[in-house]
Amino acid sequence: MDPNMMIVKTLSETDCSHDNKLILPRDKVENIVRSTGVPVPRMGIQVEILDNTNSYWVNLRQSQRGYFIGRGWGELRDARNLKAGDVIKLYWQNTKFIFSM
């Protein structure tokens, strides 16, 4: 696994709130964007997150402060019963993120 394609994140209260947004580290996402050549338009891009046997389609977007996963995050968060303090990993492989804890 290429560590440059991995996002490791400790979930915050904001990530687990009803705002349904997962804030991502700007430097990690920009590294993935540079490596893959896949741009993230202002309105976002649909990406798939695989979690064992489940697939979740989410919207990866850019804001003035960085990147976040919006639409679709709440479904994954609730399915995995994620809470603030949990550590998650998103590994970019081909055209999707692979989720792990």
Curated annotation (Swiss-Prot):
Annotated transmembrane regions: none
Coiled-coil residue windows: none
Keywords associated with the record: DNA-binding, Nucleus, Transcription, Transcription regulation
SMART domains from the UniProt entry: B3
Any one GO MF annotation of this record: DNA binding
SUPFAM superfamilies the UniProt entry points to: DNA-binding pseudobarrel domain
GO cellular component: nucleus
Keyword Transit peptide in annotation: no
Alphabetized InterPro entries for the sequence: B3_DNA-bd, B3_domain, DNA-bd_pseudobarrel_sf
Annotated localization: Nucleus
Residue ranges flagged as DNA-binding region: 7-101
Listed name of the protein: B3 domain-containing protein At1g08985
Natural source organism: Arabidopsis thaliana (Mouse-ear cress)
